[in-house]
Protein backbone atom coordinates (compact mmCIF):
# COMPACT_ATOMS: atom_id res chain seq x y z
CA UNK A 1 0.00 0.00 0.00
CA UNK A 2 1.20 3.49 -0.81
CA UNK A 3 2.91 5.06 2.21
CA UNK A 4 1.08 8.33 2.55
CA UNK A 5 -2.35 9.74 3.28
CA UNK A 6 -3.40 10.06 -0.35
CA UNK A 7 -5.94 7.25 -0.96
CA UNK A 8 -4.72 5.15 1.96
CA UNK A 9 -7.65 6.16 4.14
CA UNK A 10 -10.08 5.53 1.30
CA UNK A 11 -8.77 2.00 0.81
CA UNK A 12 -8.89 1.41 4.57
CA UNK A 13 -12.55 2.37 4.72
CA UNK A 14 -13.38 0.14 1.76
CA UNK A 15 -11.52 -2.70 3.50
CA UNK A 16 -13.72 -2.01 6.52
CA UNK A 17 -16.88 -2.46 4.45
CA UNK A 18 -17.71 1.10 3.45
CA UNK A 19 -19.26 1.21 -0.02
CA UNK A 20 -17.10 3.17 -2.49
CA UNK A 21 -19.93 5.66 -3.06
CA UNK A 22 -19.98 6.44 0.68
CA UNK A 23 -16.24 6.66 1.35
CA UNK A 24 -15.91 10.45 1.21
CA UNK A 25 -19.07 11.01 3.23
CA UNK A 26 -17.67 8.73 5.97
CA UNK A 27 -14.16 10.19 5.68
CA UNK A 28 -15.53 13.72 6.13
CA UNK A 29 -16.21 13.03 9.80
CA UNK A 30 -13.74 12.60 12.65
CA UNK A 31 -15.37 9.23 13.43
CA UNK A 32 -14.83 8.16 9.81
CA UNK A 33 -11.18 9.17 9.94
CA UNK A 34 -10.74 7.28 13.21
CA UNK A 35 -12.43 4.27 11.64
CA UNK A 36 -9.95 4.35 8.74
CA UNK A 37 -6.94 4.59 11.06
CA UNK A 38 -8.31 1.78 13.24
CA UNK A 39 -8.58 -0.44 10.15
CA UNK A 40 -5.03 0.45 9.14
CA UNK A 41 -3.84 -0.48 12.63
CA UNK A 42 -5.58 -3.85 12.24
CA UNK A 43 -4.07 -4.45 8.80
CA UNK A 44 -0.61 -3.04 9.57
CA UNK A 45 1.07 -6.44 10.17
CA UNK A 46 -0.01 -7.53 6.67
CA UNK A 47 0.91 -4.34 4.80
CA UNK A 48 4.10 -3.78 2.86
CA UNK A 49 4.34 -0.04 2.25
CA UNK A 50 5.70 1.49 -0.94
CA UNK A 51 6.93 5.01 -1.63
CA UNK A 52 8.12 4.89 -5.25
CA UNK A 53 5.91 3.98 -8.20
CA UNK A 54 8.34 1.29 -9.35
CA UNK A 55 8.03 -0.66 -6.10
CA UNK A 56 4.58 -2.30 -6.48
CA UNK A 57 5.46 -4.14 -9.72
CA UNK A 58 8.74 -5.26 -8.12
CA UNK A 59 7.02 -6.48 -4.95
CA UNK A 60 4.37 -8.31 -6.98
CA UNK A 61 6.83 -9.91 -9.41
CA UNK A 62 9.10 -11.10 -6.60
CA UNK A 63 6.21 -12.60 -4.66
CA UNK A 64 6.74 -10.28 -1.68
CA UNK A 65 3.04 -9.35 -1.91
CA UNK A 66 0.01 -10.98 -3.52
CA UNK A 67 -1.76 -7.70 -4.33
CA UNK A 68 -0.97 -4.02 -4.20
CA UNK A 69 -2.27 -0.60 -4.97
CA UNK A 70 -0.21 0.72 -7.87
CA UNK A 71 -0.13 3.29 -10.62
CA UNK A 72 -1.82 1.65 -13.61
CA UNK A 73 0.88 2.93 -15.95
CA UNK A 74 3.52 1.05 -13.99
CA UNK A 75 1.58 -2.22 -14.13
CA UNK A 76 0.68 -1.77 -17.80
CA UNK A 77 4.36 -1.29 -18.62
CA UNK A 78 5.28 -4.73 -17.26
CA UNK A 79 2.16 -6.76 -18.12
CA UNK A 80 3.61 -8.25 -21.27
CA UNK A 81 6.69 -9.61 -19.47
CA UNK A 82 4.87 -10.77 -16.33
CA UNK A 83 1.68 -12.30 -15.06
CA UNK A 84 0.54 -8.99 -13.55
CA UNK A 85 -2.88 -7.66 -14.46
CA UNK A 86 -4.78 -4.56 -13.46
CA UNK A 87 -7.99 -5.07 -11.49
CA UNK A 88 -10.11 -1.97 -11.98
CA UNK A 89 -12.92 -2.92 -9.59
CA UNK A 90 -12.34 -1.14 -6.29
CA UNK A 91 -9.71 1.15 -7.75
CA UNK A 92 -9.39 4.88 -7.26
CA UNK A 93 -9.02 7.36 -10.09
CA UNK A 94 -6.48 10.13 -9.82
CA UNK A 95 -5.85 13.24 -11.86
CA UNK A 96 -3.38 16.05 -12.17
CA UNK A 97 -3.73 19.64 -13.29
CA UNK A 98 -1.66 22.37 -14.88
CA UNK A 99 -1.27 25.60 -12.94
CA UNK A 100 0.39 28.91 -13.67
CA UNK A 101 1.64 30.62 -10.51
CA UNK A 102 0.22 34.04 -9.78
CA UNK A 103 2.69 36.87 -10.23
CA UNK A 104 4.70 35.45 -13.14
CA UNK A 105 5.99 37.92 -15.67
CA UNK A 106 3.83 38.21 -18.78
CA UNK A 107 6.62 36.58 -20.79
CA UNK A 108 6.76 33.52 -18.52
CA UNK A 109 2.97 33.27 -18.21
CA UNK A 110 2.61 33.42 -22.01
CA UNK A 111 5.29 30.73 -22.42
CA UNK A 112 3.48 28.52 -19.90
CA UNK A 113 0.17 28.99 -21.72
CA UNK A 114 1.82 28.21 -25.05
CA UNK A 115 3.35 25.05 -23.57
CA UNK A 116 -0.03 23.94 -22.19
CA UNK A 117 -1.78 24.65 -25.49
CA UNK A 118 0.78 22.47 -27.26
CA UNK A 119 0.78 19.57 -24.80
CA UNK A 120 -3.01 19.45 -24.56
CA UNK A 121 -3.53 19.00 -28.30
CA UNK A 122 -5.16 15.62 -29.07
CA UNK A 123 -2.14 14.49 -31.08
CA UNK A 124 0.29 15.25 -28.25
CA UNK A 125 -1.96 13.66 -25.65
CA UNK A 126 -2.16 10.55 -27.83
CA UNK A 127 1.64 10.31 -27.92
CA UNK A 128 1.75 10.74 -24.15
CA UNK A 129 -0.83 8.01 -23.53
CA UNK A 130 0.91 5.61 -25.91
CA UNK A 131 4.11 5.95 -23.89
CA UNK A 132 2.53 5.46 -20.46
CA UNK A 133 -0.97 4.11 -19.93
CA UNK A 134 -2.49 7.21 -18.38
CA UNK A 135 -5.63 8.66 -19.83
CA UNK A 136 -5.24 11.79 -21.92
CA UNK A 137 -6.37 15.16 -20.57
CA UNK A 138 -8.06 15.90 -23.88
CA UNK A 139 -10.95 13.50 -24.63
CA UNK A 140 -10.45 14.01 -28.36
CA UNK A 141 -7.18 12.07 -28.07
CA UNK A 142 -9.06 8.85 -27.22
CA UNK A 143 -10.10 8.38 -30.84
CA UNK A 144 -6.42 8.50 -31.86
CA UNK A 145 -5.36 5.68 -29.54
CA UNK A 146 -5.04 2.04 -30.61
CA UNK A 147 -7.45 -0.37 -28.89
CA UNK A 148 -4.55 -2.15 -27.17
CA UNK A 149 -3.49 1.11 -25.51
CA UNK A 150 -7.05 1.97 -24.46
CA UNK A 151 -7.41 -1.40 -22.75
CA UNK A 152 -4.84 -0.38 -20.12
CA UNK A 153 -6.60 2.87 -19.20
CA UNK A 154 -9.34 3.46 -16.68
CA UNK A 155 -10.72 6.24 -18.88
CA UNK A 156 -11.21 4.09 -21.99
CA UNK A 157 -14.86 3.31 -21.37
Region locations from a protein language model:
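Extracytoplasmic ligand-binding site segments that recognize negatively charged/polar headgroups
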Residues: 1-57, 61
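A bilobed periplasmic-binding-protein/Venus flytrap-type ligand-binding module shared by bacterial periplasmic
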Residues: 13-17, 95-107, 127-130
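Short amphipathic alpha-helical coupling segments at ligand-binding clamshell hinges
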Residues: 35, 39, 106-119, 127-130
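Solvent-exposed loop/turn segments at secondary-structure junctions
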Residues: 4-8, 72-76, 91-93, 105-106
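A ligand-binding cleft/hinge motif common to bilobed small-molecule-binding domains
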Residues: 67-83
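Periplasmic-binding protein-like
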Residues: 1-10, 33-34, 39-42, 82-102, 118-141, 149-153
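Short, hydrophobic alpha-helical packing/hinge segments within bilobed ligand-binding/sensory domains
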Residues: 56-59, 112, 125
